[in-house]
Design a protein with these regions (language model features):
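Non-catalytic terminal accessory/regulatory regions of metabolic enzymes
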Residues: 1-97
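Catalytic beta/alpha-barrel core
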Residues: 6, 142, 158-169, 178-191, ...
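Conserved, mostly hydrophobic/aromatic
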Residues: 53, 100, 125, 174, ...
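Short, well-ordered coil/turn segments that N-cap beta-strands
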Residues: 93-95, 121-123, 155-161, 176-178, ...
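Active-site mouth loops of central-metabolism enzymes
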Residues: 95-112, 135-140, 160-164, 183-185, ...
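Glycine-rich, proline-tolerant flexible connector loops at the mouths of alpha/beta enzymes
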Residues: 126-144, 299-310
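Alpha-helix-loop-beta-strand connector modules within alpha/beta enzyme cores
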Residues: 139-163, 195-202, 251-265, 311-333
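Catalytic alpha/beta core domains of metabolic enzymes, predominantly
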Residues: 199-298
């Protein structure tokens, strides 16, 4: 249930009303925007009569919500959420680009890529240390050593770092990571979602290969229900009958997610197609669809990359793309971070 309070409702009376609701065993998601003050009730509200709610002098109106997600629901929180990653803001009119190699291969490689993407305008540095691969014989990443190299690249550039966590046992290793990524294959790893929800670092949650938008948002709800509401959603393409591309980018899903939820939505055009030549056009389309950011793979020598070289841009290609993206973001009235 959503309760809209009167703008001039006295704080004392609002607190008293909230205490009454909490005494009924309900959790309250209190969202105060520029024009509205909303109480989102989480729990069993079937026994609460709307007439009883409306009789309270602080209440403007109320309505029941059918969606299973509450904290992530835009009806509970009408204003866009802004997630701050070490000073880089994403959402609410703020646009950020995350860039870097799919996997960390050496200190020289990650440092060079970091310096180039930062100079081109990327706000955050990505780099895979733990790699979930389809084949057990493929490169699995440099693991904890890779994390150390990623931190060195952060020191060299000042850019906050983003990397993927594979399981709950790795969480202590991620204390110095600025934005923790939960990958597509772990989107419904509920124990991992709860674990990252219990810590305070922002979380980048990628959509699963064959998950609906509601399932995607419900995974974000798992994180938020544990107390961490700094969640960024990432559309990275879904599996369809089409075989000419690695995945199919769901740009309609980006638009729909902004209607469903107040959380920021970024797009990964690299994984969405699997072809570097397609990445620039998909990135431009994502901005036009209202994305709050991009996540792009950049490698100094894609032909020799140990992971996903075919979808990685060179630093020069990324430079050229960023020149266009910067103008496009400005055209659509967003602020480039």
């Amino acid at each position: 249930m959503i309760i809209v309070l009167k703008q001039d409702a006295p704080d004392v009376q609002v607190r008293e009303f909230c205490h009454e609701l909490e005494d009924m065993g309900l959790q309250i998601n209190d969202s105060k925007g520029s024009d509205t003050h909303i109480l989102g009730l989480i729990g069993d509200t079937k026994a609460i009569a709307e007439s009883w709610v409306l009789a309270n002098p602080v209440v403007e109106t109320c309505r029941r919500v059918s969606e299973p997600y509450k904290k992530a629901n835009r009806k509970f929180h009408p204003d866009d959420s802004v997630v701050d990653v070490e000073g880089v803001k994403i959402g609410g009119g703020n646009f950020a680009v995350i860039a870097g190699p799919c996997s960390i291969e050496s200190e020289e490689q990650i440092t060079y890529c970091a310096q180039r993407v930062k100079a081109a305008g990327a706000s955050l540095l990505r780099g895979g240390a733990f790699k979930p691969r389809t084949s057990p014989y493929s490169f699995q990443g440099m693991r904890s050593e890779g994390l150390d190299l990623l931190k060195l690249a952060r020191r060299a550039t000042g850019a906050p770092i983003v990397t993927e966590i594979m399981n709950t046992e790795h969480l202590p290793l991620f204390e110095n990571v600025d934005l923790i990524q939960v990958g597509a294959r772990n989107m419904q790893n509920f124990e991992l979602l709860k674990a990252v929800g219990r810590q305070k670092k922002p979380v980048l949650l990628k959509r699963g290969l064959a998950n609906t938008l509601e399932e995607f948002v419900m995974s974000a709800e798992y994180i938020m229900a544990e107390g961490n509401e700094n969640v960024i959603l990432c559309e990275r393409g879904i599996r369809t009958f089409e075989t000419s591309m690695r995945n199919t980018l769901d740009l309609a899903g980006v638009v729909m997610l902004h209607k469903m939820t107040h959380l920021p939505v970024v797009v990964d055009p690299s994984h969405a197609c699997g072809h570097a030549w397609m990445v620039p056009e998909l990135a431009k389309a994502a901005v036009a669809a209202g994305a709050d950011g991009l996540m792009i793979e950049v490698h100094n020598d894609p032909a020799k990359a140990k992971c996903d070289g075919a979808q990685s841009l060179t630093p020069d290609q990324f430079d050229e793309l960023m020149g266009f993206i910067r103008k496009e973001v400005e055209f659509f009235g967003k602020k480039m971070n």
